[in-house]
From Swiss-Prot:
One of its GO terms (biological process) is response to blue light. Forms an OPN3-dependent complex with DCT in response to blue light in melanocytes. Glycans are attached at residues 86, 111, 161, 230, 337, 371. This is Tyrosinase. Glycosylated. Binds 2 copper ions per subunit. Pfam families: Tyrosinase (PF00264). Residues 498-529 are cytoplasmic. Cu cation A binds at residues 180, 202, 211. It comes from Gorilla gorilla gorilla. Keywords: Albinism, Copper, Glycoprotein, Melanin biosynthesis, Membrane, Metal-binding, Monooxygenase, Oxidoreductase, Signal, Transmembrane, Transmembrane helix. Its main location: membrane. It catalyses: 2 L-dopa + O2 = 2 L-dopaquinone + 2 H2O; L-tyrosine + O2 = L-dopaquinone + H2O; 2 5,6-dihydroxyindole-2-carboxylate + O2 = 2 indole-5,6-quinone-2-carboxylate + 2 H2O. This is a copper-containing oxidase that functions in the formation of pigments such as melanins and other polyphenolic compounds. Catalyzes the initial and rate limiting step in the cascade of reactions leading to melanin production from tyrosine. In addition to hydroxylating tyrosine to DOPA (3,4-dihydroxyphenylalanine), also catalyzes the oxidation of DOPA to DOPA-quinone, and possibly the oxidation of DHI (5,6-dihydroxyindole) to indole-5,6 quinone.
Amino acid sequence: MLLAVLYCLLWSFQTSAGHFPRACVSSKNLMEKECCPPWSGDRSPCGQLSGRGSCQNILLSNAPLGPQFPFTGVDDRESWPSVFYNRTCQCSGNFMGFNCGNCKFGFWGPNCTERRLLVRRNIFDLSAPEKDKFFAYLTLAKHTISSDYVIPIGTYGQMKNGSTPMFNDINIYDLFVWMHYYVSMDALLGGSEIWRDIDFAHEAPAFLPWHRLFLLRWEQEIQKLTGDENFTIPYWDWRDAEKCDICTDEYMGGQHPTNPNLLSPASFFSSWQIVCSRLEEYNSHQSLCNGTPEGPLQRNPGNHDKSRTPRLPSSADVEFCLSLTQYESGSMDKAANFSFRNTLEGFASPLTGIADASQSSMHNALHIYMNGTMSQVQGSANDPIFLLHHAFVDSIFEQWLRRHRPLQEVYPEANAPIGHNRESYMVPFIPLYRNGDFFISSKDLGYDYSYLQDSDPDSFQDYIKSYLEQASRIWSWLLGAAMVGAVLTALLAGLVSLLCRHKRKQLPEEKQPLLMEKEDYHSLYQSHL
C-alpha cells in the first residue's frame, strides 16, 4: 500500500523551492542583478498587476559586524544576496515567494486571507498509516527534481561575474541538504586558502531563527509537492533518552547486521545516497558541492566520543536552558556565557551556562551521538533524523519565547558575527527573510507543538478572556447591584445594633456573655465583610 501511494505521488507532482529560482539564473538576470519573475496568475513581474507585489531595490543593513570574519568582498554570501541580485520581488500584504505567488506562513487561500494553525506532533504519536505517509513524502522529495530552483556549482567569480552561469538541477530533498551545506561552508579565499571561522546559521544568534525558517520552507514545499496542506514535520522528544529509540526499522532505520556504520537493509532509508559531505575535497579544489551522490547514509548511534558527549540531554538540562533570561551575551558566538542560544545549541554547559569547548551538549550532543552523516555540520541534513531533531530544538526555542516574551529588540541589532544581525537577510534564501522576522512565536507563523498546547499559559488567558469581556459588558449592572447591597447591609447592621441594645437592657450586666453566639458572630462578620 505504501509503495502504491509513493509511486502514484512520484508520477503526479513536479515542484519545489529553496535557493536560486530557475527563472533568475540566466546571464541576463545575473549581470543585471535582478530576480523578479512573473507570477503565473497574471504573467506580470511579482504579480504586480494583481497587487501581489512589485520589483524593488534591496535595502541592506549597514549595522556593524563582529570581528570573527576579518575580510570584505571575498565570499558570495556577504551582504546576502547582493553579489547575485540587488532587485527582487517585494510582496504586499500576506503574499510571499520569489514571484509573490505563495502565502506568508500561517495564511492560506487564493488571496492569502485565511488564518490556519497546524500542529507538529511527536513521531511516536503518529499512527502506522501517518508514519508511512511521512516516509513516503520524504522519498517522494528525494526522487522529484525541483522545477522552481537550481543550485550554483561555482562561485560568482567562477561564473565570470554572471556571464557564464553554472547551475545544476537537484531533487527537492537534496536541495535543502545543499542549502544547509552552503550556509555553513568555509569561505574560499582563492588559491588553496580558506577561512573556517564563518557560518551563517550556527554558532551565533541566527542559529534558532535560521533553522526555524529552514523547517518551515521544507514543510511548505512538501505541502506543495504532495497537495497535503495539513502536513507537518513530526518531532523526536529526546529528553532523558538512554539510546536512539527512533533508530529502528519501524522508524528511522536500525543498524546493518554486518556493518554497524550503515543502515539495515530493511530500513526505509538504506538505499538513500547522500550529497555535500566532502568538505575538504571542495575546499582543496575551491569548488562548491554540485549535488553528485557520494555514498550511503552512515549512522552508528552511541559509538561516539563519550569524553566529549557523555550522555544525551535530560529534562533538567532543557529546564536549565529555559531558565536563562538572556538570549545572547558577550561575543555572541560559541564562547558566549549564560546565553540561552549558546546553551541550547550545545557550546555551553546545561549545568552552569558557561561555554566549554571540550564538551558538546544539548543540540550538538544529538549530532555527535549519531556518529555518522549527521555528525558533520555541512552534510548533516542528509539524515532524515535531522528534521525530527531540529523540530524538537525549535519547540524548546518556542518554550523560551513563550516563557520570557522578549521584544524583537532583544535579538542583537549589531556586532554579531557576519550574517547574524537582526536585519541581515538569511543565506541562502530567495525570497528574502531577515533573522529578526523569526524571533516571534510559532503561532504567529501558523504552527504549534502538540505537547505545548496543554501547558501553554496563553490557553488560560484565552479561556478567561471571554469571561472578562462578559464582565465588562455587565459592569454597570454589577456596580448598581453592589450599591444596593451596601444600602441593605447598612440597614441590617442598624437593626442588629438596636436589637443588641434592647437585649442589654433586659440582662443584668454580670450575666451578659463576653462573646456572642457563634451564629451571631458569623452573621456579623459576614455583614461587615
